[in-house]
Amino acid sequence: MEKKCLKQNSTKFVAHYRSLSTTTVAKSNVSTNERVTWFYKIENASDSSWLPFGDIEKEIIEKAFMNHEQQVQLDRCLVNLEENVRINKEDSSFRMPVKRCVGLSSDYIGLRPERFYIPQKLVKSFSDWKSNDRRFINEWQRQNRGLSMNELLEQAADGIIKEGIQLCEPIEAKWIADELLLLKNKSNEEIEKRVVSIYTRESFLYRLVNATLRENDLSKLYNLGAFCWLLFHCDCSSTFLSLGYAGKLYRGAQLDKDTIESYRQAIGLVKTWDAFSSTSKNRKKAETFGNTLFIISLAKSAKYRYSGMDISSLSLYPDEEEVLIRASRNFFVDNIEQDNVTGKYLIYLSLC
């Protein structure tokens, strides 16, 4: 059995690929503008499916392939590029066929569940916190004033490598760290766009960042604070003015009765979500999961011009139509309704 450190693809996420008709192509036929996807085949008594490697795994494999390397090491396996097989690190006799495909759609058919549907913790607004209370990003900033951009990138890279080792993801973590270190001495625009692009990838990073922020886990302040700060400040950067979005947004969730009641009790109050929030402009996709749909608008008295950053153009999944709401953005809880037909709860929020 393979070591289970962190599951990369949920069942729902990979299900889309099971029905795809894919074609392996030779290197000489590939356009540099075409999307390349690497698959491995699972075969057992109940299933025979081609499943995709993770986003970062695919980039690592593709680089090795283009460099004519015979074998590439990933966190969970080896990929032999001469024999086109995926080899279990703990049991080399356990092998799966591998293939390379070009020109597939870049998007998942719906929204990635762990990105768009994980319930956010409803907490008091930032203005309600006492001076001795500490929130993750603000506490990191308080302890790390005066760092240069290069020092920020170095700290972010070093911390992600440390977290990756703890999660049994050292190779994926090193890829992320190397990408960040390549940004040293680059323009702010190039840095910010790449930070957002890295965040959109299906990897351990966005899950870990948001779990840390939701729990306000200050033990990870050094390891994740710099990356969180970089991503947080993209929202108010001139780089993203053209990507600002002020329209209606949607996010699904599966909430228990107590959590729904907490929103009901908060009607008319200002609250916040401590984590970054992935929302979609597409209501139909957002409401396919869970018993609750958040309908998010921009308050007329909002301090900011936009609800969030439309990052779909920087994402490997543009059809998600993702708009990212920054961490700790305050909002009013306006109302709660329950749809008489579907039974789904509709929670209306307006961003301050």
Roles of regions detected by a PLM:
Residues 154-312:
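Internal glycine-rich, Lys/Arg-flanked active-site/core loops of soluble domains
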Residues 246, 328-330:
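Tight coil/turn sites that cap or link beta-strands
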Residues 2-159:
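Eukaryote-biased intrinsically disordered, low-complexity acidic regions enriched in Ser/Thr/Pro
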Residues 330, 336-338:
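Residue-level recognition of beta-strand microenvironments
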Residues 274, 291-293, 320, 328, ...:
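Active-site lining segments that contact anionic ligands and/or coordinate catalytic metals
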Residues 341-352:
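Short solvent-exposed strand/turn elements
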Residues 303-327:
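Flexible, small-/acidic-enriched active-site or ligand-binding loops
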Residues 38-40, 84-86, 250, 282, ...:
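Structural signal for hydrophobic/aromatic residues that build the beta-strand cores
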